[in-house]
Amino acid sequence: MAMSVPGGRAVLMMAALVAAAGGPSSVVLGAELAAASRLAAAAATILAGDAGRHVAALADDAFEGREAGSRGGRAAGAYIVEAIDHLGLEPAGDSGGFYQPFGNMRNILALARGSDPTVADELVIVSGHYDHVGYGNASNSYGPFGFVHNGADDNASGVAGLIEIAEALQALPARPRRSILLAFWDGEEKGLLGSYHFLRVRPEPLRNFRIVFCINLDMIGRLRGERVEVYGSRTSPGLRALTVAVNNRAGATALELAYDWKIDPDSDHYAFIERQIPTLMFHTGLHDNYHRPSDDVHLVNLPGLESVARLAFATAIAVADEAAPPRPFREACRRESGSSQRLLEAQAAGGKRGRWGIGTRSDAAEPQAPVVVRVAPDSPAARGGLIVGDRITMIDGVELVDQDNMVQRLGEAGERVTMIVDRRGRLIQIELIDGR
């Protein structure tokens, strides 16, 4: 039968599995668990109530829809600077301040410098745009025009998440190894102007940094069914595995991760992908209030915003603390699309049943997690609860290397096999029994 792997127990179980496989000593595992506990404590400072106050402020009529370059847009920028000014972050804009002006618009940039001198010049960016469409017009609104478009979800929700992440960074007892830049983009609704400007003209405090990763938050305020869309997971090998691992530290509150392969110029993550920088975007989906005056505060799912912001924070820390060199950009992501994804994940026609009743396909970006595309009826796999779309990540406590390794391991197995599978971003334990 299928069984979800609960939160703190998931960490302990994985530690035990690693130790049983001849992995790190109990001292190392104890240190890792202590670090996970400190990270969880910092993430716990990201709170729905605090985020809600920022959403309510930014989506107030007084900001007149936060159009880039407008009076309301500039007032929104001033609000953000006031919210982060006391957090001990370094201003990373021009002239010693947080602002990076361009035209009549302003990005807002705040730096948490890394703790390891050998990699502190490597920059992980966590970003979101703070502008919206003002009163709306035929080019940027679905109407009615002439009314304040408050943009509570788009993107006061993402900005609130960023401010909460800034506070969580200050709650960490020690900074991560790499530096983290919090970037609030202006001009996104006018064509990703702020992120493009930043990539073309780096402010003086950041000119000696190398951007190694970007996480973008856009419209994270309408979580439905615990499902968050994840874009960019194909921009570097193993990004799905990374986000799944981070997500499952939350245990019972782990979100359903809906990975989408498409890459469209619809938010600031696109500018970084164009520059061949590995990038993720978290997004809770479009809705009928998108770019309408009705995108208002009372519709925002604040507990959901809290969950997505905590996931983004923990992902940023995981990347910033990685011992390995920066993740490479995966050029093949540009040639992949929704149809490529459907081809990989499509159910396979019936074939030879085999001992366990499992058919899989290998994923070039995640070879260590073969995709289940066939489960034979009345097979050990079917009886154990394996379903099409699951990704097999571990067999009997040992992580897989690739599909060939999986086939070998299953061929050598006894009458029982315990698997850990990634099911839409949640880790599930499956037990297969060979009833021959």
Describe the residue ranges of each PLM region.
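A non-catalytic alpha/beta surface segment that caps or lines the substrate-entry region
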Residues: 57, 66-113
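Acidic/His- and Gly-rich active-site-bordering loop/insert found
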Residues: 58, 84, 102-140
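Alpha-helical metal-binding/catalytic segments enriched in His/Glu/Asp
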Residues: 110, 126-128, 132, 137-192, ...
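His/Asp/Glu-rich mid-to-C-terminal helical/loop segments that flank catalytic regions of hydrolases
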Residues: 171, 288-337
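Metal-dependent peptidase/peptidase-like ectodomains
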Residues: 185-287, 301
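PDZ/PDZ-like groove recognition
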Residues: 334-388
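Conserved PDZ fold ligand-binding element
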Residues: 381-404
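PDZ-domain C-terminal substructure recognizer with occasional recognition of PDZ-binding tails
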Residues: 387, 393, 407-436
